[in-house]
Amino acid sequence: MVRDYPKYKVAAVQAGPVYLDRPGYFDVNATLAKACTAIEEAGKNGARLVVFPETFLPGYPHFSMGLQTMAEAGEFFHLWKQYLLNSPVVPGPETEKIGAAAKKAGCYVVIGINERDPEYDGRMYNSILFMGPHGEVMGTHRKLNITINELFFHTRGDVTRVKPCDNIRVYDEPLGKLSGLICGEHFQPLLKQHLIVEGEQIHAALWPGLAMIKTVMLVMTQALCVSARCWAVLAAPYVAKEAVPKDTYPNNHFHQSIGGSCVIDPFGNIVAGPLYEAEGILYHDVDLGL
């Protein structure tokens, strides 16, 4: 009997979170509404899988990249507090709204969140939230190897959570074997090897706004596609100049959020995008039998 491999449309959402002037800095509700609008738009255009950038809710901690002296520490601590207060828990009100949007659109959603730990007050994770097409929380992946400046905020993910390797799970779904990694995890050989051994077919590559998107970040995602013979939906943010708060912390790196989202086939070819210097949703029809 000849096996039929899934064919469907994927979407990479290239957008920026909603940022505020001090003292608020973040607006998780406005960013959540923006995400739900994008999910519904992608669903109307036929997408079955929608991928967002790293820590889209409530935004990437750009301010941690430029901390130079303890003279800035007071503002930094306030930023940390606002970041925590605007970060979702799983499950929670934010996951309910994303789930409702996913159900309405009839698609899977993979979105980066700054996850707040409901059990340990003040603990945060750089996480991927996986949502199913019926609005259900499939699970989360908490970043295992924190990238340099993110150590100011994020706790390492635990590979023993729930059951061994549940934190780096490959989901066996009707659209294929789905998983994802965050940013610098694409540099970790053993993490990629785990996905390969588990038979990953469709990969969500979540990246922040960094200038190296045009070189290292793109190449590392392509390398995974070739190694695993999988598709990848790479999502990176774009923050327009007019969207940058006028009264904000001086050590910001918003200028690095230039986009770079794309879709990559199992041979490492870029088949959609990359999109730079604009918000938008990239689409491509993938064929897991390729």
Question: Predicted segments — roles?
Answer:
Residues 1-49:
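N-terminal active-site segment of His-dependent metallophosphoesterases
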Residues 3, 231-290:
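C-terminal beta-strand edge segments of enzyme domains
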Residues 11, 129-131, 262, 282:
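Conserved hydrophobic/aromatic positions in well-ordered beta-strands
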Residues 16, 56, 114-115, 187, ...:
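Catalytic metal-binding/acid-base residues of hydrolase active sites
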Residues 39-68, 102, 109-110, 185, ...:
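Active-site beta-strand/loop signature of hydrolases that rely on acidic residues for catalysis
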Residues 58, 65, 129, 140-147, ...:
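Short beta->alpha transition motifs characteristic of CBS
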Residues 63-87:
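A charged helix-plus-loop insertion that forms the helical arch/lid used to bind
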Residues 89-90, 94-100, 104-107, 115-202, ...:
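Active-site catalytic loop in hydrolytic enzyme cores
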